[in-house]
Amino acid sequence: MAGDLPPGRWSALLVGAWWPARPDAPMAGVTYWRKAAQLKRNEANDLRNERSLLAVNQGRTADDLLERYWRGEQRLATIAHQCEVKSDQSEQVADAVNYLRDRLTEIAQSGNQQINQILAGKGPIEAKVAAVNAVIEQSNAMADHVGATAMSNIIDATQRVFDETIGGDAHTWLRDHGVSLDTPARPRPVTAEDMTSMTANSPAGSPFGAAPSAPSHSTTTSGPPTAPTPTSPFGTAPMVLSSSSTSSGPPTAPTPTSPFGTAPMPPGPPPPGTVSPPLPPSAPAVGVGGPSVPAAGMPPAAAAATAPLSPQSLGQSFTTGMTTGTPAAAGAQALSAGALHAATEPLPPPAPPPTTPTVTTPTVATATTAGIPHIPDSAPTPSPAPIAPPTTDNASAMTPIAPMVANGPPASPAPPAAAPAGPLPAYGADLRPPVTTPPATPPTPTGPISGAAVTPSSPAAGGSLMSPVVNKSTAPATTQAQPSNPTPPLASATAAATTGAAAGDTSRRAAEQQRLRRILDTVARQEPGLSWAAGLRDNGQTTLLVTDLASGWIPPHIRLPAHITLLEPAPRRRHATVTDLLGTTTVAAAHHPHGYLSQPDPDTPALTGDRTARIAPTIDELGPTLVETVRRHDTLPPIAQAVVVAATRNYGVPDNETDLLHHKTTEIHQAVLTTYPNHDIATVVDWMLLAAINALIAGDQSGANYHLAWAIAAISTRRSR
């Protein structure tokens, strides 16, 4: 029971045991996790852009680097999705608590009005006490109902966070952290002495809106006083705010107890300036006002002073690990430690940046010294800030890298031309002043600057990110660009055309990659538990969509975008992956079971290509072939044997038989997905045949031909084995 009860003398008795505090922590968690999700999205987009720029490279090193960037992008996208789930469920918790407070306020207002009317009426005190207790009992019952509903919503929100992050049971976790899920104890009935004392004394400190009332004789107990503990807003058991709440810290004020009931009253809001102790990184936070979502509270200010692991540092360490050859991007190892650990692991304090030596420049006399005001040509340009080398990260074991010098040391200024001395030059002599050649700039080292070993799977630090194949093609252009050999106009035009073609190819590949990803996400949202892949074939003219269910068969309930092609029915290898089924492609995208899926956007393709995509070689005598295949397949339900004849001969199928056939199809559908990827091919064949029968009932001859052709191909695959 919080200290901000609804107004009214009897509010504590009416709704006090169910009254929660304001959901400030969940509301702060909504904003915090939403911003964290956006940061992770931006980092994933940055990695996607870098991967698109590197797509022009060839070779094992380039493929390995692209794979690492892709894994990092998927990991960041998963973390962003988890942050969004935490934000949404924190908002659900806050809404549940706010709704509970509103309903309890209405119940308290109605109960106070009824009790005041009872007390203002005429009659013996015993009758008034009985009527007041009846109103309190009725209000307690309504408060118990709305409190149970709010608790159920909070538990559901907590469970959703567990399902998307670390797994576990919300009920067990809440009980382990001291939250009582039982019905709170109701206050004891009011006596005549209690009513007399409350009506006679109405000071400001009473839980009914007055001063502390004198406790009745029935509440006085003997024995040493026990230390009060804060209670759960939905129960009487003590509520553990964090796993470190019993450790050393500032002492808390004693908790005042209610004169009615057994539940102690927690103190009111803390005084201004009070800083709550920070929660440990691994302990989920329980917000005030009900059990909140794990880790949904915003990190306290005390924890922010320890330089938490920010998305910028994660992205920088990941990129540094890629370019310096550290295996598997050692700077991003915090990502693989779990979503909670990656979001809260602190970094060591940064080292002070090194001082940059100042370079003195010779003083040149200007017109200002002669009394003429000097007007600069442009605004003064600020000097570039010194680049601080990254410090050693103890948590991620990242090797420090010395800053690279983009240019050589500054050339010494040329001395001014000396005044002519001696006789004037003869007629026709060279009047140009002598030119002092500046010292040659030492070449910039191209090898690894730090002491980190350069693995064969990553480019050397400071070196080019282009593969050897691309470097060979651009080597003549680099050689011709040297000052010693003048560049012919034709060679310059050729180099410019080559550069433009490479940039255009990279942009085209990036656009196609995004288009394939949108197609893949649109289809995978309907069955996220399957593996999907999409790619471009025939020099970018055909968009192929595949899944490894029965070596390429697309289930009937999957709606397809327009302008895509599916695999033709044919016997194929049993355990072929989606990559194997896709074959040779120019650009491809893949979805793994229960992987990250982006939210629909305005560019999401419309699902209008079902009948145009599901095509297969025409089967002669489709109806008789389907009837014969169904009869030979004895594992089908009996309803299929009865319906297939009526469907092929257009006799008409009753609605109850159609519904029963759909029900059997759904059961087989669930059985296949439960055992996927180790599904039984015979069960999938049953699904194909039922899909063909349903297509005939719906008048889709092309769809029935497609599903029957796949069933025949799957049966041939079983026999060949």
Curated annotation (Swiss-Prot):
<feature type="compositionally biased region" description="Low complexity">
    <location>
        <begin position="491"/>
        <end position="505"/>
    </location>
</feature>
<feature type="compositionally biased region" description="Pro residues">
    <location>
        <begin position="435"/>
        <end position="446"/>
    </location>
</feature>
<feature type="compositionally biased region" description="Low complexity">
    <location>
        <begin position="419"/>
        <end position="429"/>
    </location>
</feature>
<dbReference type="Pfam" id="PF18645">
    <property type="entry name" value="DUF5631"/>
</dbReference>
<feature type="compositionally biased region" description="Low complexity">
    <location>
        <begin position="202"/>
        <end position="224"/>
    </location>
</feature>
<feature type="compositionally biased region" description="Polar residues">
    <location>
        <begin position="470"/>
        <end position="484"/>
    </location>
</feature>
<feature type="region of interest" description="Disordered">
    <location>
        <begin position="370"/>
        <end position="513"/>
    </location>
</feature>
<dbReference type="InterPro" id="IPR040833">
    <property type="entry name" value="DUF5631"/>
</dbReference>
<dbReference type="GO" id="GO:0052167">
    <property type="term" value="P:symbiont-mediated perturbation of host innate immune response"/>
</dbReference>
<feature type="compositionally biased region" description="Pro residues">
    <location>
        <begin position="264"/>
        <end position="283"/>
    </location>
</feature>
<feature type="compositionally biased region" description="Low complexity">
    <location>
        <begin position="232"/>
        <end position="250"/>
    </location>
</feature>
<feature type="region of interest" description="Disordered">
    <location>
        <begin position="196"/>
        <end position="291"/>
    </location>
</feature>
<dbReference type="Pfam" id="PF18646">
    <property type="entry name" value="DUF5632"/>
</dbReference>
<protein>
    <recommendedName>
        <fullName>Uncharacterized protein Rv2082</fullName>
    </recommendedName>
</protein>
<dbReference type="InterPro" id="IPR040604">
    <property type="entry name" value="DUF5632"/>
</dbReference>
<feature type="compositionally biased region" description="Pro residues">
    <location>
        <begin position="379"/>
        <end position="389"/>
    </location>
</feature>
